[in-house]
Structures are given as structure tokens and as C-alpha cells.
From Swiss-Prot:
Enzyme class: isomerase
Known partners and oligomeric status: Homodimer.
GO molecular function annotation: diaminopimelate epimerase activity
Catalytic activity entry: (2S,6S)-2,6-diaminopimelate = meso-2,6-diaminopimelate
EC number: 5.1.1.7
Protein name: Diaminopimelate epimerase
Family: Belongs to the diaminopimelate epimerase family.
Organism encoding this protein: Magnetococcus marinus (strain ATCC BAA-1437 / JCM 17883 / MC-1)
Entries under PROSITE patterns matching the protein: DAP_EPIMERASE
Gene assigned in the entry: dapF
Amino acid sequence: MGERFIKMHGLGNDFVVLDHLESPRELSPQEARFWADRRRGVGCDQVVQLLPGVEGGDAQMRIYNPDGSRAEMCGNAMRCVGLYLHEQRGMAAALAVETLAGIMRPQVTSALAITVDMGRPQWAGRAIPLDQDGEMIDAPLEVGGQSYRMTALSMGNPHGVVRVADAEGFELAKVGPLVEHHALFPNRINFEVVQVLSRSRIRMRVWERGAGITPACGTGACAAAVACMRQGWVERDCTVVLDGGELQIVWLESDRVMMSGPATEVFRGELVGLPAGF
């Protein structure tokens, strides 16, 4: 018997989902890299492992980047997991899913409308974390001989948001890895460039930590929207336009951030066998 998997995506941000709810086991960084490899494995932006909840949640979600490192949270993956647990596992439409960033609560209305309470943004430098105290709001960051004005925050994982005049023309493949590995960010960082289109609409592109450029990032969309909202550039209910589609982000007066968007199951399969050593 091989290893069964489900291929899903949220706005083109694709995942290999491993359902280990009934047979929990550890997933090594080497195995995660294999699953994510688009030539030798199945291929994905991130590997998502589902395990039994240990803190009262319906399930536990572990996220692995293509380089084998762990990610604290992924909004697009959370929508996919919510849809899978509800439609295929028969769980309630309102779920509690444990992550390294805490318990997240997806609410499934349909495959086109999954809303996730993403929690509260964290602005303190040590909470993101940054290698400095205090907040980083529209502050200069020197990268590759250029200066960018960055707002840093955590949405359960670290994000750096820079406003640009032209998101499409920004050299994200060049600047992204330099920002990710900047000395200011001890745990590395996800990097978003954002162009304000109107008071209710922004264009965002993302360089994900450990994954590179991806079509969409749920936590990144939340971070970009909230960074713009805090500085008064947009309203507190905003559409984020990503390479893969659109997400709706609302920053409530309670300080909680709500993300709404679709999730899609693409196919299911069975890996005949892992290479020796896994």
C-alpha cells in the first residue's frame, strides 16, 4: 500500500494534503521536500499534514515549505483544510484547527466561500520577530543597495509589506530572497509588495519564505491589507488582488482579521512508494 494524498489549491497556491488523522506519524524535512518536488515527487507550494487535535481542536495542521522547513500558518491552506474536513470528513461547517500560530477557525459556506478568523495582527518587533524592539511602520529598509519603506507584522507568521507604484513591474524574484534573508529577520520573513488601486482594492504580489514567488498567500493578503488599513490608505474592508485571484479581507473593530475566498480539490492519488530513506 502506498501513501495516499489529496492535491488542493487556494487561488493557485497549491498543496499536497496528507490525511494522517487516523494514522499519525512524523514527517521529516526530507520527506516534505520530496512531496513538494515538482519533478521527482508530486509538487506543491507547501505540504499540509493533518493530525488529530491535541488542544481540543477538530484537527491539527502542520505546514512544510518546499525546503523542508516548517511554516506557522497558511491562510490558503486553512481554507483548503476547512473544505476537506467538512466535505470529505463530515465535520461541521464551523471548525477549529490547531496550528503553530494557534487555533484557527474556518467557516465553510461553499467551496467558493470559506471564511477564516485569522486572529489579531501583531506589531511588536520581538513578536514578529525582528532583531529590534518597537514597531516597524513604513520604516526604511536597505536591501541590495536600494531603500524600501516597510511595515512589518505577524499574522501568525512574519510579513514585511512594501508599497510600490507598480506591483507588476517590481523585480520580486530579485529582491524577494534578499528581503527574506535580511539580518533584521531572525526567522526569515514573507515579503509582500502592494499597489493601492482604490480605497477598497489593492494589488499584491508575494515572495513566500522557503517557497519563493507563489500565486497567492492568505496570511500575506491579510498582512498587506492590514498594513494599508493601519496607515489609512484603504478602508477596513478591502479586496486583495493576487496573481491567482481575489481575497476579501476585513479588519474588525475587535482587532480580528477575517479572510474570505475559495478552495479547490484538484485530484487524489497514491504514491507507490517513497524513495529509500523515508
